[in-house]
Amino acid sequence: MKIVIPMAGLGTRFAKVQDQNPEYKKPKPFINVKGYPMVRWATGSLLFLEHPGQNLSGPLRVPMENLIFIILKQHDLEFQIEKQLKQIYSDKINIVKLEAVTRGAAETAYMAKEFLDPEEDVLFSDSDHYFDGKILEEIILKKGAKTAGVIPVFVPPNDGIARWSYSLTQAGTNNIIQVAEKDPELMNKGAYANIGAYYFSKAKYFLQEVEEVMEKNEVSGPSGKGEFYIAPLYQRLLNKGMELEAAVLPEVWGLGTPEDLEYFLKNCKINHP
């Protein structure tokens, strides 16, 4: 398995309030969260990724050389991102540097193509969350032969705001039957919210779909703010008769906004990833 961490966004929500906390002047993945960079909490959620000092023996074990980060070249020049990442993880990690911000998360993720084997599985994960990944690991290990992907999800708050991408499952099962980005209609059907990590049992399932949507310029999301998102690629797989499974996680923490981070610091009893 390859694990890809796209972190080539601008992180403007923290930058706008940097006068409140000197940490917010840093690139978001390196903001200090209980003594660890935020990105370390995100990768620590992936229990099968062998971090420095660990000695994993499970069948899903992913070594450091299979970890890929996607960063902005400008950020690297300003903040030595590559150097920091290698200090946190290993000199064996892979770094992709982009000249500019892309047209969305799916296009950013696609920039790791050179490191992906079309027949090998891949997991894409945001760098600004923390979750209990045990069930994700179990579902990946037990997935059916026809399963094209696994999406870790959680039960969203019932506040009527469609702020996530969503996965609707067949009643009484983990079988996903519909996926969409920030879709109020799907949310109102009782869909789970996607946490921002996406597993494909073969990288080609991702690569083929993202290449097609970019070629046709099929953007997703709210009107006027369309981007290339990863979640809608799964709906394309469903439309082709492929199967998807949801991994319903018991504990999920967003870290991507100042409000989310403050809530995590005040309420999460876990002190290290």
Regions found by a protein language model. Name each.
Residues 1-8, 12-24, 31-32, 36-124:
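Conserved N-terminal catalytic core of the sugar/cofactor nucleotidyltransferase
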Residues 29, 92-94, 175, 243-245:
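Conserved beta-strand segments of alpha/beta enzyme cores
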Residues 45, 110-111, 138, 232, ...:
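Alpha-helical elements of Rossmann-like donor-binding domains used by nucleotide-donor carbohydrate transfer enzymes
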Residues 70-72, 96-98, 152, 182, ...:
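Conserved beta-strand termini and adjacent loop/short-helix elements that scaffold enzyme active sites
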Residues 100-105, 158, 252-255:
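A short acidic, often aromatic-flanked loop/helix-cap motif at beta-alpha or helix-coil junctions
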Residues 126-130:
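The conserved acidic donor/metal-binding loop of glycosyltransferases
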Residues 132-215:
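Conserved core of the sugar-phosphate nucleotidyltransferase
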Residues 191-273:
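Conserved alpha/beta core of the MobA/IspD/sugar-nucleotide pyrophosphorylase nucleotidyltransferase superfamily
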